[in-house]
Amino acid sequence: MSTINTNTNEVMPHISVNAQYIKDLSLENPSAPSSLAALDQRPQIDLSLDINITNLSEENFYEVELNIEAIARNEKYTLFQIELKYAGVFNLINIDSEQHPILLSVHCPAMIFPFARKIIASCTQDAGFQPLMIDPIDFGALYHKKMSEHQN
């Protein structure tokens, strides 16, 4: 029988979320109220997403910012345009620095994305439209695509 020593002072590697917040939020409803009468057809949604990572002054503290922009259009109108900058402050505790890029580009954005998604859904609904429910995002695939583009 083996014994596991649980009396160590060693802190296990983990990611701590210190804060989450809206940095910037803008919703434009440029064709209202005419656009609200044209909701019988499904609009075309153009969506863009970008991730910014900032190393904060303290060791192993990072700000990860999601920049999401969505524009909804139909044949006649731009229905709405929403822009959201949503960020989190993360502390990478006892994690090898070689793992930081993938954690900051994949795991941290995945942790805060559901909150950004909810904000966008609520705002678009409050503007008189069906809530914009952004599909889940594969941050791992985005990271690997970006890395392969940098290598070429």
UniProtKB/Swiss-Prot annotation:
GO terms for biological process: protein folding; protein tetramerization; protein transport. Pfam families: SecB. Keywords: Chaperone, Cytoplasm, Protein transport, Translocation, Transport. One of its GO terms (cellular component) is cytoplasm. Homotetramer, a dimer of dimers. One homotetramer interacts with 1 SecA dimer. Signal peptide: none annotated. NCBIfam families: PRK05751.1-3 (NF004392), secB (TIGR00809). This is Protein-export protein SecB. Belongs to the SecB family. One of its GO terms (molecular function) is unfolded protein binding. It is found in: Cytoplasm. InterPro entries: SecB, SecB-like_sf. One of the proteins required for the normal export of preproteins out of the cell cytoplasm. It is a molecular chaperone that binds to a subset of precursor proteins, maintaining them in a translocation-competent state. It also specifically binds to its receptor SecA.
